[in-house]
Amino acid sequence: MFCFQCEQTAGCSGCTGAAGVCGKKSVTADLQDELTGALVGLAHACMNNPKTEQTDRIIIEGLFTTITNVNFNDETLREMIARVREEKGRVVPGCAACMSPCGNTSDYDMKRMWEADEDIRSLKSLILFGIRGMAAYAYHAMVLGYTCLLYTSDAADEED
């Protein structure tokens, strides 16, 4: 386990071992990394293939699920991983049957990020945590029925 995304981080350097200061277990941290890697794989799949109507929603929900202290339920994380992989199958049908894996839709191994040069790791972590933060706002907006920035403009004040 390696986690350093919250203010409770042990010694201001990250939690390691069997559990974090916040109570997150090592297995849960691994599942969050697996979910993040699956989300990266789905994003790669969408680079050259059209998304479905649900793709963005699943990505936002998946990112929100990995935010600190949002969800430490291992079964929920496993279900979200399965949903992300199922969505990838809809975006790129038949990819799993390909005899020549190209790597364009593979899940990303988060260990590569955590074991990268510290400057690269820091930059990628900053980007990831920022995207997760934006996903939190987007997730709550979706739950409330908002779908775009149009609602922040004067157009939202106009009556139909």
Where are these regions (language model features)?
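Cys/His/Pro-rich metal-binding microdomains
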Residues: 4, 16
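Boundary segments of small protein-protein interaction reader/adaptor domains
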Residues: 123-131, 135-145
